[in-house]
Design a protein with these regions (language model features):
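Solvent-exposed, non-transmembrane regions of integral membrane proteins
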Residues: 1-754
Length: 754
């Protein structure tokens, strides 16, 4: 009876958490917290579940120490969460330079926000927003203040990922005033909940590792399973791939023969630096992104991306007639009878009122966001990119470093002595820019355009060489290092995701058919036995090199967006496969196919997005550890998913595949547990809240709890049956899909990409 109640409450908790994330999307975060996460009944369910779980463990007289420690850690974590909910104080304090403040706006579930008094006062002395050199991308925020506590005075400072503590209060940088003379700090006082919760985390980390090494634990027993040593696993995997459009290079049409720069000249243009996506990068990078975003490919009719970009800059009228804008299938394409690729001039017609989709775009921003209007907005976005390029707005290739004290302006709010700003030829220049530099910035492209139109290519080449020297002299410290520049040029030359997904899927199918041949014919091909593991290693090294390049270029661990995280999952899949293939040969097939599909997803869905600066709060070692460990768990769970599909299709090998799947499942749960709660520690360090019920962390917890069910084979013997296990483990992967894709693109929260 107790077991049934526990099972019902367990499912109820999962359903409530999932429902709350969906409700949050429609009703808002405050509503979800008030009526779900913070509701008395939700807390009661957790409390009863924990109490009954403890009672059940005692009743069953569980003697495995690692199991006892693991479940005890969850009870301690829940107790800490309850203490935080009951006793913690949270709020925001607004400081202005020179004005002492001893009150803050506290969060209150009933009244919303109410003013509370602090036992000390704060007086802001200085606020500073530090920028990445030459850009308006913030590197860090910093607030310096004086703390007055009775007769005692002390100096304090907070910045992103750097907190200040006084008594039981902790202060975090949250926001700032636009005039730079005020700062908003988050304030948190939780003297009881955090120590208890952290104790639970520590015990959890110890017990998760202990679980893998405990001689009495299920994992060590699993490793001794004779089924894993058979190696007689056969698979029949049906893989379907959608039509992948390959754009064959063609020679440039006659219309473009006189509207492009020679390849060598365009390459010199691509070697210049530009301020793009809040960082300084080669113009080549901007050109590639321009082509991919507008045309959907890295080149156009045999022309390089640099030739395409320079063509639009210098021969815009000719290029406006080229079918360069890719039109996706949709209601608008059908209604307006648009081709697959349309020209810019297609959307400008005087007889139809000028901008033919302008009305639909306006309706979209007024709230009509159906599929027809969404496509109008998508096309409008591409057209705006082209228009900004033709007008020169996006060509921020002309740097200037201010040497004197200057006043910030509305157009340039962050300029001061020693800072570098990158201008376009049409930007409004501050008066502090020296006259000669101002003339050069305003006129260089006009002069360059004259030589291009006159066909004086040698002078155009000289212009680009001199412009590069000007950038080196006038850019201060804002240029990337020589190593970063070379790394980006290499990264631009080789689309790693595209090359590797084709290679890995091809080799994966070869490995799959060879495995079937080997198991049915009882014969081996020595060449493939040697070549396939080597090629897996080569693919792994190539992906490692690609990720290393992105790391060098950005200066951050390459996990900052969906594209990079897909690459990281593929990397972990291949790493695990390489480490395990000597013992279990079938893992190599998994390694090729799963990594290939992750790379395919990154290629199709993301098209290699621009590398950008990381938000200051994300620039933390704890975050890098959190994301990398979570990615490792996803990689392991993807292997259990494949085992599940195979187990359903090939029931004669269900026992072996179940044990193989569980071999991946235990370390997957360990890494996921580490990843979730290291993320909680990072959140507490960064903004003072170790668990905020964000959609991503909620679904990560749901996923952890769903997968944890199947390791309880003693209390739930039904999961010893191979078919039941495989069906459950296959369906469980839907929670991974929801955690990764559903939250990122459909739900709300700090992790959402939508």
């Amino acid at each position: 009876m107790v077991k049934k109640i526990i099972f019902i409450l367990y499912i109820l908790v999962l359903v409530c958490m999932a429902a709350a994330t969906i409700v949050e999307k429609s009703q808002g975060t405050d509503y979800a917290h008030a009526h779900y996460y913070g509701a008395w009944w939700f807390i009661l369910i957790w409390a009863v579940l924990a109490a009954l779980g403890a009672f059940y463990i005692i009743k069953r007289k569980v003697k495995c120490a690692s199991t006892l420690a693991l479940h005890l850690s969850f009870i301690i974590i829940l107790a800490g969460a309850l203490l935080t909910h009951i006793s913690a104080k949270r709020g925001m304090i607004h400081l202005r330079i020179g004005q002492p403040t001893d009150t803050y706006m506290a969060q209150d579930e009933e009244q919303g926000m109410k003013e509370e008094k602090l036992p000390f006062s704060l007086c802001l002395q200085k606020f500073e927003a530090k920028m990445h050199d030459g850009t308006n991308a913030v590197a860090d925020y910093s607030s310096k203040f004086t703390v007055t506590d009775g007769d005692d005075k002390s100096e304090g400072e907070v910045s992103m990922n750097n907190i200040y503590s006084h008594r039981s209060y902790r202060l975090y940088q949250s926001s700032y005033d636009e005039d730079g003379k005020g700062s908003v700090l988050a304030i948190n006082a939780d003297p009881y909940g955090i120590p208890v919760t952290y104790t639970g985390y520590a015990l959890l980390f110890i017990s998760l590792v202990w679980m893998l090494f405990d001689p009495k634990g299920g994992y060590r027993k699993l490793l001794k399973s004779p089924l894993l040593k058979k190696g007689a696993l056969m698979t029949a995997l049906i893989l379907s791939m959608g039509n992948i459009q390959t754009l064959h290079a063609e020679s440039a049409t006659g219309n473009l023969q006189n509207a492009v720069l020679p390849k060598e000249t365009a390459e010199k243009f691509g070697e210049l630096h530009i301020l793009y996506n809040d960082r300084i990068c080669p113009v080549q990078t901007f050109a590639l992104d321009f082509c991919k975003k507008i045309y959907g490919a890295r080149s156009y009719q045999g022309l390089t991306a640099e030739q395409v970009l320079s063509g639009w800059v210098f021969y815009g009228n000719t290029w406006a007639n080229e079918p360069f804008i890719k039109i996706k299938s949709g209601e608008m394409k059908t209604a307006m009878n648009l081709p697959d690729y349309a020209s810019l001039n297609t959307f400008f017609n005087r007889e139809m009122g000028g901008y033919t989709i302008g009305q639909y775009v306006q309706e979209y921003y007024n709230g009509q966001q159906d599929k027809f209007h969404q496509q109008a907005a998508d096309i409008d976005g591409k057209i705006q990119i082209i228009m900004e390029l033709r007008e020169g707005v996006s060509l921020k290739v002309l740097p200037y470093t201010f040497t004197k004290n200057v006043k910030a302006t509305k157009d340039h709010p962050f300029i001061k002595a020693g800072t570098t700003t990158w201008f376009s030829p049409v930007d409004k220049l501050p008066q502090a820019v020296e006259h000669q530099h101002a003339l050069y910035i305003r006129n260089v492209f006009s002069l360059l355009n004259g030589d291009v139109k006159a066909g004086n290519i040698s002078r155009v080449n000289e212009f680009f060489v001199k412009m590069k020297k000007y950038q080196e002299v006038s850019s201060g410290n804002s240029l990337p290092t020589a190593t970063q520049y070379k790394a980006e040029r290499i990264n631009n030359a080789f689309p790693f995701a595209t090359i590797l997904f084709m290679a890995n899927l091809t080799l994966g199918f070869i490995a799959l058919f060879y495995t079937i041949y080997r198991m049915t014919k009882k014969k081996e091909i020595k060449v493939l036995n040697i070549a396939l593991p080597i090629l897996l290693g080569v693919s792994f090294l190539a992906l490692t090199f690609g990720l290393a390049l992105r790391w060098i270029i950005s200066g951050n661990v390459p996990m900052s967006n969906g594209y990079e995280s897909m690459l990281t999952v593929a990397w972990f899949v291949m790493l695990i496969s390489i480490l395990m293939q000597l013992r279990i040969r079938i893992v190599m097939v998994f390694g090729f196919l799963i990594s290939g599909f992750f790379l395919l997803v990154s290629h199709i869905n993301q098209m290699d997005p621009a590398i950008g600066q990381m938000m200051p709060v994300l620039n933390s070692p704890l975050l890098s550890i959190h994301v990398s460990i979570i990615m490792m768990s996803y990689a392991l769970l993807s292997l259990t998913f494949i085992c599940g599909i195979m187990g359903i299709c090939m029931r004669s090998h269900g026992d072996e595949l179940r044990d193989l799947s569980r071999l991946f499942l235990y370390p997957a749960l360990t890494t996921m547990g580490f990843g979730i709660f290291i993320g909680a520690i990072w959140a507490n360090v960064s903004w003072g809240n170790y668990w905020s019920w964000d959609s991503k962390e909620t679904w990560a917890l749901i996923t952890f709890m769903i997968y944890a069910v199947v390791v309880h084979t003693q209390s739930l013997p039904v999961f010893r049956k191979p078919l039941v296990y495989h069906i459950y483990i296959t369906l469980a992967f839907l929670s991974i899909a929801m955690t990764y894709f559903g939250v990122n693109y459909f739900l709300t929260g700090m992790h959402s990409y939508a």
